[in-house]
Amino acid sequence: MSNPIQAPDGGQGWPAAALGPAQRAVAWKRLGTEQFDVVVIGGGVVGSGCALDAATRGLKVALVEARDLASGTSSRSSKMFHGGLRYLEQLEFGLVREALYERELSLTTLAPHLVKPLPFLFPLTKRWWERPYIAAGIFLYDRLGGAKSVPAQRHFTRAGALRLSPGLKRSSLIGGIRYYDTVVDDARHTMTVARTAAHYGAVVRCSTQVVALLREGDRVIGVGVRDSENGAVAEVRGHVVVNATGVWTDEIQALSKQRGRFQVRASKGVHVVVPRDRIVSDVAMILRTEKSVMFVIPWGSHWIIGTTDTDWNLDLAHPAATKADIDYILGTVNAVLATPLTHADIDGVYAGLRPLLAGESDDTSKLSREHAVAVPAAGLVAIAGGKYTTYRVMAADAIDAAVQFIPARVAPSITEKVSLLGADGYFALVNQAEHVGALQGLHPYRVRHLLDRYGSLISDVLAMAASDPSLLSPITEAPGYLKVEAAYAAAAEGALHLEDILARRMRISIEYPHRGVDCAREVAEVVAPVLGWTAADIDREVANYMARVEAEVLSQAQPDDVSADMLRASAPEARAEILEPVPLD
């Protein structure tokens, strides 16, 4: 897709949506010299959505992220893009309807290359009441979804449920209900939202940490930033600043020296990843627990199983899973499996934090059960809470609150009509997968894999291999991915470190038993020419990544959060100049 807005000095053969080294240098210069309408803090899905919403209203936008795009909550979800079936028990009908509308919109229009339909089985284990109770809930869920791109529910006897999921324990099953929902690679989706914002003119820069809020009297007029790579500092001026930092909301709020309208509480959610052959099933599963639900979701050649829900008051950047977390997940899922899972079956584990609203203060906040928008100081807007699926609505609400500080008339949100990069032409390319594969010497399944990660941007990815066909070969110890995907992550997707690539642009860190260690050097050598790494840089990146994996694995054997956090914190930061926490003075 061609870019209609070319930044000054940005024409290096790549569009502005390509978040590579050249764009990064230009972005730093622009941040320190230009006046912006909106400065967004936070490169998660909500912050990226805010940047896209504001840019497509015609505003001049800057987005700064202290670490990597989606490095927090937005890469560590259950990978569900759903309405929230469990919220119906809480009678949150309006919220579920809103989320289901967003699901339909992304599935059909905004991001069909990233958001995918998936059949789920709800195993029934209670003899008389469970089927009508769950069926009524799923029926309402289907009806609230409105326009249908997925089939309605279907009921099964025990024999029928076992045909769908032969791996279930026969003695604990009386039947099942199949329904459809959708899944997404959250990190890739978030990165694509940010790149789409850049396509429409937003200045997007990672490793750019906010360390101060600039003030003029009682009004916030911008932010002080620090480069997390080299410690350089700059001031970024904007008519309004949007705090979309999730679990870091209170930390940024503290920089304003104003009392916040709400506080955010971090809740830890842990997932485990096991090979597909450990659970024999043709469908995903949703299991009831005492407090919530547990998802068993197919993920390529694996299953993702989770989640937990416990308070977390330690390191926000690196939440750690414990042995107790993993035991809880295994115990829950093993209650319905014919062949129990063990710790030895696990290929990957990840922990993320949900930003939950802990309370709110007055009527100036726009509040809902799901998210809240507030104006804690003139020129400062904060948004928190919510769920991944409704990121677009959250972003529109935040920018609606921000426009009062912009000295010009501002158009309403139009992101309902703005497809993400890669969506345009996706369905046609799926039909042409065999032809594309023949031209590139790739198997059609490999082309479809690329299409489901890049959509119509596949042409940009493959173009990188035109001068070096060896990039089309698989990564030796992670053959599910091509070398060119690593190179493209560095050249166009904002990746600056090995961790960014192995954990977020690709999911090697959770999809292989070695968690990326065995392919770290190979991938580092592929991206070194793109990022200008020396041999010493390669050695440092590999060592840092291996230390991260070792710390995570050791922490996952600990009995409690405190001991797990201490071990995880022992690994060095990939971004050497990151400040954690930001000093308030």
Swiss-Prot record:
Keyword Cytoplasm attributed: yes
Record bears the keyword tRNA-binding: no
Enzyme class: oxidoreductase
Domain of life: Bacteria
Protein EC: 1.1.5.3
Catalytic activity: a quinone + sn-glycerol 3-phosphate = dihydroxyacetone phosphate + a quinol
Matches recorded under PROSITE patterns: FAD_G3PDH_1, FAD_G3PDH_2
GO MF, one example: glycerol-3-phosphate dehydrogenase (quinone) activity
InterPro entries: DAO_C, DAO_C_sf, FAD-dep_OxRdtase, FAD/NAD-bd_sf, G3P_DH_FAD-dep
Family: Belongs to the FAD-dependent glycerol-3-phosphate dehydrogenase family.
Descriptive protein name: Glycerol-3-phosphate dehydrogenase 2
Organism listed in the record: Mycobacterium tuberculosis (strain ATCC 25618 / H37Rv)
